[in-house]
Structure formats: structure tokens, C-alpha cells
Amino acid sequence: MKVICEKTKSPLVISIPHSGTDIPQDIDSLCNLAAKREHTDWALQELVTPLSETTLVATVSRYIVDVNRFKPRTGKATQPIIPRIDEKGNLLFNNYPSKQKQVNWLERYYTPYYLHLENLLNEKLEHHKRVLLVDLHSYDDKLFNTSDIILGTRKKQTLSPATLEQLQILFHEEGLTTQVDTPFSGGNIIATFGKQARIEAVQIEVPYSL
């Protein structure tokens, strides 16, 4: 992972969990070269860099470890976090990682992302009464009946009505239309941090065509 503009004065932290393209060498040998990885969130780093806001970026591909997925509540399976197939149904791995490898990958990539994000948010809370976490994504609007900006709030559990309205106004002033929680309501990142005191969180999905 990497951080862009770690020290800023604003109460905003941006998370980009799905732009990573790295496949570590020890993992690459397990991968199926024929698999597609089309739903990487392209160009988001270029979008946020001019904003000069504190941003955490996952550098490892979401097709290796998806840091926005929920851990299973029971059992030890990590399939939701370490996917098995691509969008076309192709196996992502010639040899799906053993349980021990799965645990190791989560320790290397999943847990550190949350710890680092928590540290960035706590640092902001030392200087601000409230902090906003934006979990930034992009989506292929050819696959959905919309090209709106999607604001995910976990059914309005992670974001106050006032902040949601402010965000909608900001996008509308730029000529952009928005939808709330449809078709994306947000993943584990906003679910984890959006329920914490003094932190609001929103998942923002930007269409590829924008």
C-alpha cells in the first residue's frame, strides 16, 4: 500500500482499495495467466492526486486480496476476500492457495490496510471534531442501467443526512447526477469505520465513462 499526502489540514481521508495491479512474485506462480482482471478501478489515483488530500491506496490487486470484502463471521474460510474466479468465470489461480497461505496473505495485505487507515483517521481526529472517510471506486457503467455517481452509505448507516445532502449538492453543481445505495451500498471499509464515533464514511463509485 502507499499513502499520498499523508499530512494535510483537512478532515478528509480517501481510501482507494481496488486500483492495485501488483501481483507479488511468490503469488504470481499460482495464478492463471488466462484469467481476466478487468474490474480494477482504473485512473483513480490520477483523479485524486491534484486534490492533495490524505489518500491510502492498496497496491496489490483486488484479485489477490480484496480489502473491501467482509471477513466471514463463522468458520475460517476467506474465499470472499481471496476470490476464486474472474468476471468471465475463469479460475484466477491454477492452484488456489492453501488455508495457511490465505491466512498469510490476509496478514500481509488485508489487516495492514485497516490498521493504516485507522491510524490516518485517528490522526485526523486529533485535530478535527469529525472526520469524513471517502472510499473511492469506479464501475463499468456499460453493465448497469446508470451512469450516475453512486453514493454508498450502508442504507444511510455510515453517513448523516446532512453530509449526504452536501455531497449530492456538490456533485450536482458539477453537472453530475447521483444515486444512493443502488446498485452499490458500500463494503467492509465504510461498514467498519462509519460506525465509529466522530467518523462518517461513504463509498463513492465513479462510472468509467466519466
How would you name each of these model-derived features?
Residues 1-133, 138-210:
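N-terminal catalytic or cofactor-binding beta/alpha core of small enzyme domains
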